[in-house]
From Swiss-Prot:
SUPFAM superfamilies: Aminomethyltransferase beta-barrel domain, Folate-binding domain. Belongs to the GcvT family. Its EC number is 2.1.2.10. The gene is gcvT. The glycine cleavage system is composed of four proteins: P, T, L and H. This is Aminomethyltransferase. It catalyses: N(6)-[(R)-S(8)-aminomethyldihydrolipoyl]-L-lysyl-[protein] + (6S)-5,6,7,8-tetrahydrofolate = N(6)-[(R)-dihydrolipoyl]-L-lysyl-[protein] + (6R)-5,10-methylene-5,6,7,8-tetrahydrofolate + NH4(+). It is an enzyme of class 2 (transferase). GO terms for cellular component: cytosol; glycine cleavage complex. Transmembrane segments: none annotated. GO terms for molecular function: aminomethyltransferase activity; transaminase activity.
């Protein structure tokens, strides 16, 4: 594990007794108490995640918008003012380089937040595509920490720690301001299916911020949460994970991300391939499964219909909120329908599952 990267909060995690695991080249906390307990705390109260392993790349210059438009399938013209956008970033053949968040940082500047295991690849890809554009591309990941405060009590916990009017900050909106005396980019975003905030700030401040936010939220029930709970939370919300629901061989259309593919915006990497897919129809589709028989479906387990293999599980787990075993699966288009039954081969045994509408979980409206 000596070659694995560590976030600025590594010492905090070890001191708290977290179980550390390898993830995308990083040594990260998978859990502190238990995955189920941390999961339920986020659903019912709040959890604080160290997501400093995520990457941050800036694009600055007169041609910044033009380059971002070339890179993204979504329309970067929609990332204006305080609006954050989510987008896949594709290869010319329609496969996915990565999926990311985009923050407009003023005239001619964008912040791209990329997945931890893809930082170097994404940075090289963006630099390659920047040839001929009047831009400066910088990888600021090592200098940037990121915390995610997630759950229905996130606003209640964070509001006393800043003068920023967080209550009026809409979902997928961002602002800047001081939190506990540290300058932060504050974003009302997350990867759990719950309300919450993601904070970006200088890496040196991470240990103090971590300790002080946890202390401030303790009476409200805030706990540190690891990557295990983050994964079960995002799976219940049917949020894709790169390398599972997205990848070089899985297009955004196959993954069900149609609304983030804006063919009408003009040329971008992968547009021709994705336009052809949309016209002809995708060969595969992402579906949700709840297990009828016992057994937890795991990635790459075969999915069958009438005894014939039609696809495979991309992600699967016990869903603590639902008390069921669930999965996302990539299957041949047109072979299943919502409410129908399929089978998952789990260690050579056939287990029945039902095709369900996604997401598995949607947070209650207030």
């Amino acid at each position: 594990m000596a070659d694995l990267k560590k976030t600025p909060l590594y010492g905090e995690h070890v001191a708290a007794g977290a179980k550390m695991v390898e993830f995308g080249g990083w040594l990260m906390p998978v859990q502190y108490s238990s995955i189920i307990e941390e999961h339920q705390r986020v659903r019912n109260c709040a959890g604080l995640f160290d997501v400093s392993h995520m990457g941050e790349i800036t694009i600055k210059g007169p041609d910044a918008l033009a380059l971002v438009q070339k890179l993204l399938t979504n329309d970067a013209d929609r990332a204006t003012g305080d609006r954050v956008i989510y987008s896949p970033m594709c290869y010319p053949d329609g496969g996915v380089v990565d999926d990311l968040l985009v923050y407009p940082r003023g005239e001619g500047e964008y912040l791209l937040v990329v997945n931890a295991g893809n930082i170097d690849k994404d940075f090289a890809w963006i630099q390659e595509n920047a040839s001929g554009f009047r831009v400066e591309v910088s990888n600021i990941s090592a200098a940037t920490a990121q915390l995610a405060l997630q759950g229905p009590r996130a606003l209640e916990i964070l509001r006393p720690l800043t003068r920023v009017d967080l209550a009026s900050l809409g979902y997928y909106r961002w602002t800047e301001g001081q939190v506990l005396g540290v300058h932060c980019l504050i974003s009302r975003t997350g990867y759990t299916g719950e309300d919450g905030f993601e904070l970006y700030f200088e890496a040196a401040a991470a240990p103090t911020m971590w300790r002080n936010i946890l202390a401030a939220g303790r009476e409200a029930g805030l706990v540190p949460a690891g990557l295990g709970a983050r994964d079960t939370l995002r799976l219940e919300a049917a949020l894709p994970l790169y390398g599972h629901e997205l990848g070089p061989d899985i297009s955004p259309l196959e993954a069900g991300l149609h609304r983030f593919v804006r063919l009408e915006k003009g040329e971008f990497n992968g547009r021709e391939a994705l336009a052809a897919q949309r016209e002809a129809g995708v060969r595969r589709q992402l579906v949700g499964l709840t297990m009828i028989d016992r057994g937890i479906p795991r990635p790459e387990y075969p999915v069958l219909a009438a005894g014939k293999e039609i696809g495979y599980v991309t992600s699967g787990s016990l869903a603590p909120t639902l008390g069921q075993n669930i999965a996302l699966a990539l299957v041949a288009a047109g072979t299943v329908s919502t409410g129908g039954e399929v089978e998952v081969s789990i260690r050579g045994r056939v287990n029945r599952a039902r095709v369900v509408k996604l997401p598995f979980y949607r947070r209650p409206k207030k």
